């Protein structure tokens, strides 16, 4: 043992030193490659393919003579495949520099080589695999260093040399193709584990492939194949037998994709067997099967005896002491099961074939699955059938990356001859076979693709109801609205008491054709999920084709919820309330509304803007009185009627509160990260109208002022429906859900503090492509200037706007703080962190001009509760 360790110690430095020499040369080649363009590379690869093709017979002969395995004529075909088919499949591949430049979608793809590649080649396909790997490496500007199988060193090196000389002659760097001259495990391991080897292309025995994968770097390897071939009763039997024999005898079965077991359905078993025998297959008897097992399989490993790999059937029979007719192509053994108790069910890489008889197609599929699971996971499987249903069942069950239908497996597996698979001599087996790829390996696996992405802005939108009617008595539209026969009015008790429901019914009764009318008047402030459910039940009975939401925000929100559940009863409320970053990309898609009923919104307050928005706020009173803003453009009404007749008699407090809600909508829309040219004008006009008319509207009830505020509400609604809101509403939603204060009043108390917070430089910036940089403070100052407030600097403008809002609140009789409303500070402090956390969760937070921290939201709550201002 000491002598062995000493010898190993001496060998290690030599292996490392030798490997480093190869690596240093490869590095120089790698640098030189970077100066070549696509045209130069393509000329080099073509020259390599031509050189390999020119010597394909010479190399085939060398391979057979050196390895003592395979069939000369088939080696010729393999070498032609490795040159002609491989070159044809990669010649148009872009592998150098810019491979895609998409000006429309603003990205660019740049291909770069992965780096120095180590190529491991097998004894079974030595020259063809060398040609294949060298060509795809040079196509991608990667130097490659080969570690050839010792039993095929000379022929493999000759193949590499022929391609290298052709490559250099046509402009490739020296040493772009190298190989270990005197192979040893030390040198192979040193090369595999060298830190400058970027990738290993491993084709060989499972031990070698596993070693490659254990090197801690990307490896593209091939798992073993134990390929079942199921011949189902509807198959073309002549073709199936032809394909089976063609494939299994190709290079004496040394293609890893070759069939290892044939599974035949009982009704056709005798016919298939007869055809196989007629074409040179020899079915061994029980005694001969025992001899074949002993000679072909190493018992303790249940693995093929290397002696028989790639040998002709007659020679294998002779080695096993079995007499067979001259010209025997395949030795076939009928066996009963799969696994270690049935050694011939393993991969054999020779013209030795296991055979099974099955009663049904289902049994055939299950037997094929067993064969794959016994050492062939991920590789290939074959079915011969003309029954599409059976083919699909087979495909669904097989854990293989290549499922070949009605074709020879050897030729089908390597691709492009019998199918559209990429031509390759390295066949990935995916995670089934512990491989990193499930595809046929080719040039595209050997490049790093860098994606250069230019900044893009999201497509935005402007969505409002199809029809908006305004001016006094515009409710008269209902008398002529087309295509309605059954109308359900959703409202609250006060609308009935004030006679507003009667006004709506009056116009409906003026229609030439009478309509059926039903009223749901039980909507409470902050409508609950229970109310929505009750209204939905009424709709289900009445079956309206038109829903009229009459009232303030609560009836409209409730009606929208009822509309949704009426048309789609199975909709999940839990999914509806989920947040989104981009409304077009939300995980849960709202169903398309309007299939059963049109939706008409008639606001009787001047605040929510719900008549033109895609929002509805529903309160889940069974789970903490949480307000959930539902948002989707499907919730946008079909018709909005902005009739000031409904707001002339509103009480002062309601006008004040809802008016400040309008102002909050407009200001938040103007500073939103999604604010745009289409919403800015609406927002500014709404702000101007509020400052010009709200005080007069609330304190005197002037009709013109009421009308202007009614219009301002809708203008602000259209603005925030498309630019969205911010934390003012997030905070108000959660506060209102807990303490049940009027929504507009809550917004009004919060607004000065939110503006002051939003105008400060962010702790965290908001993410929205069009929002180039933080400008909320400047936008607030712009509002101040438009209103004629002092704003010589941005800071002065922000302060002026805050002062103007506080002054307006005082004039309207709105308290400065939440504490003035009578709430207990201790109770507030016990809840504030929870409320801040829920406010962050609110959908409105996503469009705020800066991303708030939860702790910052809690401080805004405290400022509004205690009235703290930094003057």
Region spans (language model):
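Conserved C-terminal structural/oligomerization subdomain of aldehyde/semialdehyde dehydrogenase
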Residues: 34, 322-458
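Gly/Pro-rich interdomain helix-loop hinge
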Residues: 738, 744-829
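N-terminal Rossmann-like NAD(P)+-binding subdomain of aldehyde/semialdehyde dehydrogenases
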Residues: 2-108, 136
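Glycine/threonine-rich beta-strand-loop-alpha-helix active-site module
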Residues: 90, 159, 530-645
């Amino acid at each position: 043992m000491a002598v062995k360790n000493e010898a190993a110690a001496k060998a290690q430095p030599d292996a490392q030193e030798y490997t480093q020499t190869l690596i240093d040369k490869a590095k120089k080649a790698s640098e030189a490659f970077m100066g070549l363009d696509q045209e130069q590379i393509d000329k080099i690869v073509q020259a390599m393919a031509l050189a390999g093709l020119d010597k394909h017979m010479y190399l085939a002969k060398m391979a057979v003579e050196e390895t003592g395995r395979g069939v000369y004529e088939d080696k010729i075909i393999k070498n032609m495949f490795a040159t002609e088919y491989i070159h044809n499949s990669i010649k148009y591949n872009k592998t150098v520099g810019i491979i895609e430049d998409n000006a429309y979608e603003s990205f660019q793809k740049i291909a770069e080589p992965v780096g120095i590649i180590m190529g491991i080649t097998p004894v079974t396909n030595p020259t063809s695999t060398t040609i294949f790997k060298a060509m795809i490496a040079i196509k991608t500007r990667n130097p490659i260093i080969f570690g050839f199988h010792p039993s095929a060193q000379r022929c493999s090196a000759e193949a590499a040399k022929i391609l290298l000389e052709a490559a250099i002659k046509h402009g490739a760097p020296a040493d772009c193709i190298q190989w270990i001259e005197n192979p040893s495990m030390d040198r192979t391991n040193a090369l595999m584990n060298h830190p400058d080897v970027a990738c290993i292309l491993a084709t060989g025995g499972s031990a070698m492939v596993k070693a490659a994968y254990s090197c801690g770097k990307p490896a593209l390897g091939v798992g073993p194949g134990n390929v079942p071939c199921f011949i189902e009763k509807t198959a073309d039997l002549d073709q199936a037998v032809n394909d089976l024999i063609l494939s299994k005898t190709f290079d004496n079965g040394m293609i890893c994709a070759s069939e290892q077991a044939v599974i035949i359905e009982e009704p056709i078993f005798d016919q298939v067997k007869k055809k196989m025998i007629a074409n040179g297959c020899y079915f061994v008897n029980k005694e001969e099967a025992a001899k074949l097992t002993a000679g072909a399989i190493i018992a303790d490993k249940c693995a093929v005896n290397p002696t028989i790999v790639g040998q002709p059937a007659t020679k294998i029979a002779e080695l096993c002491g079995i007499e067979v007719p001259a010209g025997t192509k395949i030795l076939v053994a009928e066996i009963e099961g799969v696994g270690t108790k049935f050694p011939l069910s393993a991969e054999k890489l020779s013209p030795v074939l296991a055979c099974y008889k099955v009663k049904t197609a289902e049994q055939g599929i299950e037997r094929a699955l067993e064969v794959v699971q016994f050492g062939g996971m991920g590789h290939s499987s074959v079915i011969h059938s003309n029954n599409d249903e059976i083919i699909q069942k087979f495909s669904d069950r097989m854990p293989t990356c290549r499922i070949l239908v009605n074709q020879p497996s050897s030729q089908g597996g390597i691709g492009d001859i019998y199918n559209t698979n990429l031509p390759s001599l390295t066949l990935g087996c995916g995670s089934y076979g512990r491989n990193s790829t499930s595809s046929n390996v080719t040039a595209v696996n050997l490049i790093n693709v860098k994606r250069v992405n230019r900044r893009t802005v999201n497509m935005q939108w402007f969505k409002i109801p199809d029809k908006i009617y305004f001016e006094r008595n515009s409710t008269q539209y209902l008398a002529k609205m087309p295509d309605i026969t059954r109308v359900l009015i959703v409202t609250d008790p006060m609308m009935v008491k004030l006679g507003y429901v009667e006004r709506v019914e009056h116009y409906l009764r003026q229609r030439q054709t009478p309509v059926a009318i039903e009223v749901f008047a039980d909507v409470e402030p902050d409508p609950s999920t229970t109310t929505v459910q009750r209204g939905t039940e009424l709709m289900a009975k009445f079956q309206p084709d038109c829903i009229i939401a009459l009232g303030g925000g609560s009836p409209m929100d409730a009606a929208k919820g009822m509309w949704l559940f009426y048309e789609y009863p199975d909709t999940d409320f839990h999914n509806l309330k989920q947040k989104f970053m981009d409304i077009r990309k939300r995980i849960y898609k709202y169903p398309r509304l309007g299939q059963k009923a049109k939706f008409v919104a008639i606001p009787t307050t001047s605040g929510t803007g719900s008549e033109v928005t895609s929002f509805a706020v529903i309160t889940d009173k069974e789970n903490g009185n949480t307000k959930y803003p539902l948002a989707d453009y499907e919730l946008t009404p079909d018709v909005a009627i902005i009739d000031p007749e409904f707001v002339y008699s509103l009480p002062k407090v309601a006008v004040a509160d809802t008016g400040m809600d309008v102002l909050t909508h407009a200001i938040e829309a103007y500073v939103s990260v999604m604010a745009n040219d289409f919403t800015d004008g609406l927002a500014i006009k709404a702000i101007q109208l509020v400052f010009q008319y709200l005080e007069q509207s609330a304190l005197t009830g002037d009709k013109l002022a009421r009308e202007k505020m009614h219009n301002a509400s809708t203008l602000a609604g259209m603005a925030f429906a498309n630019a969205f809101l911010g934390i003012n509403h997030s905070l108000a939603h959660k506060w209102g859900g807990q303490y049940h204060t009027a929504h507009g009043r809550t917004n009004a108390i919060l607004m000065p503090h939110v503006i002051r917070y939003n105008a400060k430089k962010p702790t965290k910036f908001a993410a929205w492509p069009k929002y180039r940089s933080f400008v909320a403070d400047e936008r607030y100052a712009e509002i101040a200037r438009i209103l004629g407030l002092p704003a010589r600097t941005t800071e002065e403008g922000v302060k002026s706007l805050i002062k103007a809002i506080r002054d307006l609140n005082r004039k309207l009789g709105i308290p400065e703080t939440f504490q003035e409303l009578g709430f207990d500070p201790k109770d507030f402090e016990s809840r504030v962190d929870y409320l801040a956390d829920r406010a962050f969760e609110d959908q409105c937070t996503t469009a705020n001009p800066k991303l708030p921290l939860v702790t910052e939201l809690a401080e805004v709550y405290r400022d509004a509760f205690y009235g703290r201002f930094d003057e």
